[in-house]
Amino acid sequence: MGCMKSKETFPFPTTLDIDKLHESEEAFIPDDSSQYRTPSPGEQQQVQEVKKLPEPGAVIGALILEFADRLASEIVEDALQQWACENIQYYNIPYIESEGSDTTIN
């Protein structure tokens, strides 16, 4: 008998369904869509104007670099400030060197 849910159809497409989907899509694609059309002179001028604009990636890259540099400087300042505070707090505690691992504690 089994569970009722197991008898329901699988809600996700199977590989067979995907193949059928691709076949139906190919029927709607016209053949002349792959032909190349030469742009008119007005369109060529618009393309050249677009090429003259600065690349957004370069502007964004410069902003990210500036932000990263500023953030790194803040991190270094905070670390030095924290080290200075800790150093002042514990400066009078003497440093004890260990004599090595060959000594045993009795």
Curated annotation (Swiss-Prot):
Gene Ontology MF, one: protein kinase A regulatory subunit binding
PTM description: May be palmitoylated at Cys-3.
Region ranges (PKA-RI-binding): 62-85
Positions bearing Phosphoserine: S40, S98
Domain of life: Eukaryota
Organ and tissue specificity: Widely expressed, with very low levels in spleen and liver.
Subcellular location field: Cell membrane
Keywords carried by this UniProt record: Cell membrane, Lipoprotein, Membrane, Myristate, Palmitate, Phosphoprotein
Positions of S-palmitoyl cysteine lipidation: C3
N-myristoyl glycine lipid sites: G2
Cellular component per GO, a single term: plasma membrane
Principal place of residence: membrane
Subunit details: Interacts with PKA type I regulatory subunits PRKAR1A and PRKAR1B. Also binds to type II regulatory subunits, but at a tenfold lower affinity.
Sequence similarity: Belongs to the small membrane AKAP family.
Function: Binds to type I regulatory subunits of protein kinase A (PKA-RI) and may anchor/target them to the plasma membrane.
Protein name (Swiss-Prot/TrEMBL): Small membrane A-kinase anchor protein
Organism: Mus musculus (Mouse)
